[in-house]
């Protein structure tokens, strides 16, 4: 028999240290990881303090993990001489992974227009697929979206006009 506390602990996400070589990049990741001044500062920070915010990964059916959020931290960890990175392991669908990956990177400054365009397109397609799936919603899609299209919701979420989102895509 398990106690209530044990059942609650089993349901919680845990932070685990994973080897960098166990984690593959997100397929078609639209954001470039480059060696710039910000990366140099991140490498130095990781050398001094370790990785302060865990990455988010999902398990792959073939073994290992797929990076959802934390590509720059993983790259910087390697440059800092680390072999592991703290990660939250979460089971996510392809669409959930895409939406989280895009959202976690949109807060970055200095995004290239090409990165925004590809990211907006990926997220919009994932949102549209989720809108078609009845198992992901407890109400009719029209009610869930409050009469708005996926493109309108995307524009609101990223702080751009609908016209600007349309131009990017």
Please report, for each region that a protein language model flagged, where it lies by residue:
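Amphipathic, charge-rich alpha-helical segments that serve as recognition/docking helices
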Residues: 31-32, 75-167
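Short, charged/polar connector segments at secondary-structure boundaries
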Residues: 1-90, 96-110
